[in-house]
Amino acid sequence: MEKPFKIAISNGLTAPAIQVQSPEDLSTALRELDLHSPRPILVVVGGASKVSEADLSRLRLLFVKVLAPLAEELGASVVDGGTDVGVMQMMGQARAEIAATFPLIGVTPAAKVALPDRIPSSKVTALEPHHTHFVLVPGSNWGDESPWLARVASVLANGAPSVTVLVNGGETAWKDVSENLKANRPLLVIAGSGRLADTLAAALRGEATDERARELVASGLAQAIDLTESFDSLTRLLNEMFSAKGGRSASRESG
């Protein structure tokens, strides 16, 4: 396992990063990054594609008014994919906007992101500049990081409550959701945010959908709340999920 190094991201901002090759190295790697457990973990997965401007504005407020303040209040760490797009960008910007101090950890394939020692390429994606730590993992395709992201969350939680929030999302988010459910992590689906989130919200309402969605409902770990619900309602539901006995929540649809 390599030692941590600093990544210069943008505007003079830097963040510590570490590259791992084996799941067995994760505990040591996270300690090397000065990330300690146990602590509550919020996992954020999904995207922001094909979202209307009105819904996009509402989504940004979800991060600024609910997710970032909740993480700060709980003393949680937040784990996501770390790139400067979609929900990961929103999470980083929300953390900066409220001047939060919680660790924001990006887990991403080393081969898919722009790194200081690499010749610039249109084939790589920029890292989000407000993340505080990066874990760089093996893989050459988006989705290769999904099991690693779930493992990072589990290692950091170390028995403390953890919850996954799904916003929008496509095929990679399916992998993220699946891996986090394997880890017995409750899932909150933001209904009305589009694509995968709406597919899963429909399944939670009992509407006919594909087999993967039916399996998710059968897990009993997933529930949904509509994007149009009040931010107080969203905050209250997430607090309930974090405090649920054993970290499990009953499946239901709100709104």
State the predicted function of each range.
Residues 2-235:
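Acidic/glycine-enriched connector segments
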